[in-house]
Amino acid sequence: MTKSFGKLAAVEARLFLREPMAVFFAIVLPVGLLLALGLTIPGFRDADPSLGGQRFVDAPFTAMMVLLSVVTLGLSVLPSSLVIYRERGVLRRLSTTPVRPGALLSAQLLINVVVSVVATTLTLVLGHLVLGVPLPGSPLAFVAVFGLGTLTVLAIGLLLAAVAPSSRVVQGVGSTLMFPLLFLAGMWLPRPLMPEILRRISDFTPTGAFGQGLMDALGGHAPQPLHLAVLAGWALATGLVAARLFRWE
């Protein structure tokens, strides 16, 4: 079974790499935005008193680029792939083979996690080499927040795949959810500049908690217990509902 799963995961990896749009939005775009905007907009590299003296390109913008990659995978790539497989009867046919449908689901999750790790590593390393962005001041905290946040976003993606009747619907719903969730995370208005009420609302959203946790870890601070609890709650709730509602056919 382990050998079969390895072959299945390798096939899924090759299929992912053959999707140029998925590779672009999940890997190239976040890294490219970080480097392009960091190099061309002087204000990104200036110390900002409203950010505690940090440069905007350091913790805030770098965290948002990491988040952008994970959200793209969780709300677009993963659910679309699973719904397309269901529409084409791939999951149903797998149920008659030694490789069960659950193995395909696990392979999809594995590929998306690996891609998110690759994109994040490139973002951090190239940001550090090109822009002087500090590496995470608290590496263990960063890994913990990144792992929990990625699990949460992928669980939301599984829920979308579970309830969406078609690939067109899941793509539309995923895109619609992506923009407000990224806004609440601080993509266009950094969280320190948000009105108090909006920032409090953001604290209880999966992307708001994820983004702030990443910023804390990048700045060398421990993530706030509230944000870890919010991420764990969203992951558990959406994961359980997705498992209950997911349809193989």
Each model region followed by its residue ranges:
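Short helix-capping/hinge motifs at transmembrane helix termini and TM-loop junctions
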Residues: L37-D46, P79, G127-L135, A164-P165, ...
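Alpha-helical transmembrane segments and their short interhelical loops
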Residues: P101-G174, F179, A222-A232, G239
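Short helix-to-coil transition segments within interhelical loops
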Residues: R93-G102, V163, P206
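Membrane-interfacial helix-loop-helix junctions in multi-pass membrane proteins
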Residues: G52-R55, P134, G186-A237
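A short amphipathic helical element positioned immediately N-terminal to and/or at the very start
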Residues: T2-L17, L214
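Hydrophobic alpha-helical transmembrane segments of multi-pass membrane transport/permease proteins
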Residues: L17-R45, A59-V77, V118, L177-F183, ...
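Transmembrane helix boundary and interhelical loop/hinge segments in multi-pass membrane proteins
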Residues: G74-V99
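Transmembrane helix segments
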Residues: V28-L29, L35-F44, A161-F204, G208
